[in-house]
A protein has these predicted regions:
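N-terminal secretory signal peptides
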Residues: 1-5, 26-27
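N-terminal core-entry segment
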Residues: 9-19, 24-305, 484, 488, ...
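Flexible, glycine/charged-enriched surface loops at secondary-structure junctions
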Residues: 58, 81-83, 266-274, 331-342, ...
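Hydrophobic alpha-helical packing residues
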Residues: 175, 179-182, 228, 325-328, ...
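Membrane-embedded hairpin module used as a gating/binding unit in multi-pass transport
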Residues: 286-330
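Intrinsically disordered, low-complexity Ser/Thr/Pro/Gly-rich interaction regions
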Residues: 315-466, 473
Length: 497
């Protein structure tokens, strides 16, 4: 066996190991790549041909919750440390007179850069919704943050064209559905080996929403997908830094550029998804055709497996444990001084993503299980204020962090990587040990938030930036009855100074 054969065999074994039971392409010869002829065209036809009336009422209602959530997070994120930096950048561009609103401010910008700014704001606090995976072979059972790449460009285009609430919902659902099915289909190695799916797959969602609103035909939409595949990017190693929200904001803007070019006659590959040298192969080493071929809207992803709306502005993987910590604190009236130590057992993949074990900034705190549990013990809450730099650097917080042992637990490891198994033990100084276990958090499809609960989260985001109460209530009511909104610019007025 020569070196080439050895290399090919080792790649094939790696692909088999990463596939975990699903049939994905090995990164060997093109002949081994799954055949899904016409896949990109099928996606484009879905975008072009789907009507508002095709979306079930319960799916529309689920979308309203995520849309309201996204608007609130854009408000809160406008007050983040990244907000002024993004606005300074956008202002320096000085592009054109046709401009869309930057939420939480009085600024307007070209659609592309308004989408970027609002996308960064939505993801700035890592508080936005999360797509659940249908397959069992996905780490944590999670895939993307679906709304951040889709809502900003859809909102910007609807505002400028004075589109209706129904137009906004249709574009939003096109984008989310396309993004999520692509994320479901690509081989797990895409995320396992470092890609940030919100940046990569989210770009397709942005293009789908924009193509729908711009009225592109099937061929133009195929080209737009070809362009946006080239634009998308993002890496997990940037988690805990400003560049994670950048990757989300970049996904939001990517679709606007791709669709602008396609509308002008720009060409690209018309089979970028399924081609042996296209997206699925180049960025994932393969894909599962059964996860996407014939599956768009069957069922809608928002319906099944669904999305989670976050209860805290931190990484999703921390939330089951945080829910259990709060439950035990309230049930036992635990005081910080009573705590000897805390053990939190999880699978190895959770420790890989919640990678900041001694955080010193708010951004790092979002990806620190030790911090998330410590701040709950000390303050009994973990909202936007608790993830500011000053909160993380408090002396009592840093001291409590030292008492938290975040470790790989064999029981959690054996439970599988498709869930966020969190095994909690709080050791008190009197010798008592309080125990809890959770796999899902509040806001997940198994324990969903109601519209009113999402509205309360929205109010918290608005209060964080001292948004006027009347405007806050207007947005809540507008989104609740979005099908009756005659002009989306009315919502923009309530979200800007």
């Amino acid at each position: 066996m020569n070196r080439r054969d050895l290399f090919k065999n080792s790649l094939a074994m790696s692909a088999l190991a990463l596939g975990r039971g699903h049939i994905y392409a090995s990164p060997g010869p093109a002949a081994e790549f799954p055949k899904a002829p016409g896949l990109t065209k099928y996606v484009a036809e879905f975008i072009v041909n789907t009507k508002y009336e095709d979306i079930p009422a319960d799916v529309l209602d689920l979308g309203k919750k995520s849309i309201l959530d996204g608007f609130g997070l854009a408000l809160a994120g406008s007050g983040s440390v990244m907000g002024p930096l993004v606005r300074q950048y956008v202002q320096s561009l000085g592009l054109g007179d046709v401009k869309a609103s930057i939420i939480g401010t009085g600024m307007k910008a070209h659609t592309r850069f308004a989408s970027f700014a609002n996308g960064v704001s939505i993801h700035a606090d890592d508080y936005d919704d999360t797509q659940l995976a249908g397959a069992k072979d996905r780490i944590y059972g999670l895939l993307t943050h679906p709304s951040v790449g889709v809502l900003p460009p859809a909102f910007a285009l609807c505002e400028l064209a004075h589109k209706t609430g129904k137009d906004l919902m249709l574009a939003y659902h096109m984008g989310v559905e396309v993004e999520c099915k692509i994320a479901e289909a690509i081989s797990p190695r895409h995320y396992d080996e470092g890609f940030h799916t919100t940046g990569t797959c989210g770009s397709f969602g942005s293009a789908a929403a924009c193509a729908k609103l711009r009225g592109l035909n099937v061929a133009q939409t195929q080209y737009a997908l070809g362009v946006v595949a080239t634009e998308g990017g993002g890496f997990r190693n940037n988690f805990g830094s400003m560049t994670k929200p950048f990757q989300a904001g970049h996904a939001a803007e990517n679709g606007t550029l791709a669709v602008d070019l396609a509308a002008l006659g720009w060409t690209a590959s018309d089979n970028i998804l399924e081609a042996p040298l296209g997206f699925f192969q180049a960025e994932g080493g393969g894909f599962d055709p059964d996860a996407i071929v014939g599956r768009l809207s069957k069922p809608w992803t928002l319906e099944s497996p669904g999305v989670s709306i976050k209860p805290h502005p931190s990484g999703s993987l921390s939330h089951p444990a945080m829910g259990e910590m709060l439950r035990l604190i309230h049930e036992n009236d635990i005081k910080p001084g009573e705590v000897e130590k805390v053990d939190l057992g999880a699978n190895h993949a959770m420790l890989t993503s919640l990678l900041h074990h001694r955080p010193t900034t708010g951004l790092q705190g979002k990806f620190s299980m030790e911090y998330c549990l410590s701040i709950l013990l000390l303050d009994r809450r973990a909202g936007l204020i608790e993830f500011q730099d000053a909160s993380v650097r408090r002396a009592d917080v840093q001291e409590m962090i030292k008492r938290v042992n975040f470790y790989i637990d064999p029981e959690a490891e054996n439970a599988g990587l498709d869930k966020m198994t969190s095994i909690l033990r709080i050791h008190l100084k009197n010798g008592k040990v309080l125990s809890g276990r959770a796999e899902f958090a509040k806001g997940s499809p198994t324990n969903p938030m109601s519209y009113d609960e999402v509205a309360d989260k929205f109010r918290g985001c608005a209060d964080f930036v001292k948004w006027p109460a009347a405007k806050t209530q207007s947005v809540i009511q507008f989104v609740k009855t979005l099908e009756n909104v005659s002009d989306v610019s009315k919502i923009a007025a309530a979200l800007t100074v």
